[in-house]
C-alpha cells in the first residue's frame, strides 16, 4: 500500500491528525455526527469519533480506487479465483444470494439452495423423533460461526432442540457436555471440511461410541465420502460443503445445520436474507457511501497511519457475547499474512490483534487500560436499539453506558490530579441494530466479512487461505508417538525436556 501514488498524501494527513482532539474535529465539521453516519437496513453505523476528516477520507478513497477495490468486489461476487494461492473462488456470498449474472456464482447459489432443502428435510425428520438434544462437533470455522448465531438467536424458551457445541480436543469438554444428556434422546453432527481434523475425529469417535453407533449421527463435509466412511454414517445424513467456501465464511452453508436446529429453519433463512441484503449494499453502493468499505478503510487508517496494533470489540447485548471470539478468527486468520499475492513481502503492517468482550462486564476488567493506558485502542461498540426482554430499565442503563463510554474515550477529562486525568483521543465506531433479529445479525456478519476483504485488497494479501495454522498441527502429529511412550526422534532440546516432564 505504501507504494501507491496516493500514499504520501495520506501519510501527510495522518501526520496532521495524529495529535488532533476528537472534539476539535467535531467542532470543525458541525455536521459530522450525521455526515459520518450510515443506515443499511436494520443496521446503523456512526464513524464520527474516528480520527480522520473529509480530506483524509478522500485520500483513503483515492488509494482504494487505485487498488481497484470496486473491481475486486466484482471479482469476488462473480466467482473469480480471488484465493490465488489455492486457485479457488471465495463464493460465500453465493450461499445467501444470486446478485450477479456470472454463471459460476448462479450455479453455486442453486447448488447451495438445493442443499438447504435437504437440510430442511433432515430437520423435519428429526422433529418427528424423540430427540431433544443435538451435539455439534467441529472446530474453527465449523464451530465459531454456528456457536455465535445459535447463542445469539436461540429462543428463551420453547426451542424444539437444545444444541450443544464441542470443539476443543480436551476430553473434559466432551465429558461435561455428555454428562448432562441422555444418549437415547441425543443426535450428533460432525462438521469438518476435510474430515481429517484431529479434534473433530477424536471427539467424533467419543460421540459415536457414546451414542452406541451412527444411527443418530449426521455429518457436514467437503469430503462426504470420507465422512460417511469414517463413522459409517448413511450417505443421506451427510450434507456437502465445498472448497469454494472457506471455513470461517461457511456458517451460511450446511455448516449452519446446528444453527437451523437451534433457532428454526425459517429463521436460518432470514439470517441468510439479512446477509444478502448487506451484500447487495456492498456490491451496488459507491465506495464513499459503502459501509463495509468505510469500516475496512478505517481499520487500515488506524493500523497503518495511526499505528494502532490492537482493535477491541464490545458487544452491549449479552446475546452477542461470542461475537469477539468469532471476529478474532474471521479477521486474524484472514489478514494475518506477511506476504502479498505474488509472494513478495508486504510493505506495511497487516492485521491488528482483535479482542473484546461483553459490556458492561468489560468496563470492570480492561476499560481502565482503554481510558488511561499508554496504548490507543480503536474500538467497535455494538448495541441494540430495541430489546426483547421485559427489563426495560436494564436496557436503558446498558445503552447509557454505550453513550457514556464512547464519549469518555473520545473526549477525556482534565484534572489537577494526574491520576484522575483522562487523555481522550480514543477513536470508536458505534454500531446499532434496530433489534437482534436474524436479518440484522446476518447483515452485521456480512459487513465484517466485507470489511476484511477491503483490508486485504488494500494490503494486497490473500484473505482466503490460512497456511499459518498447518505447521503446529504437523508437529503435533509427529510428537504423538513420543507422548505415547514410543521411540521418536525429537530434535528440539526444549521439546525433549517438556516431553520428559509430561511422560513423568
From Swiss-Prot:
GO terms for molecular function: carbohydrate derivative binding; glucose-6-phosphate isomerase activity; monosaccharide binding. Its EC number is 5.3.1.9. The active site is at 333 (proton donor), 364, 473. GO terms for cellular component: cytosol. It is found in: Cytoplasm. It holds the Pfam family PGI. GO terms for biological process: gluconeogenesis; glucose 6-phosphate metabolic process; glycolytic process. It is an enzyme of class 5 (isomerase). NCBIfam families: PRK00179.1 (NF001211). This is Glucose-6-phosphate isomerase. It comes from Xanthomonas euvesicatoria pv. vesicatoria (strain 85-10). The gene is pgi.
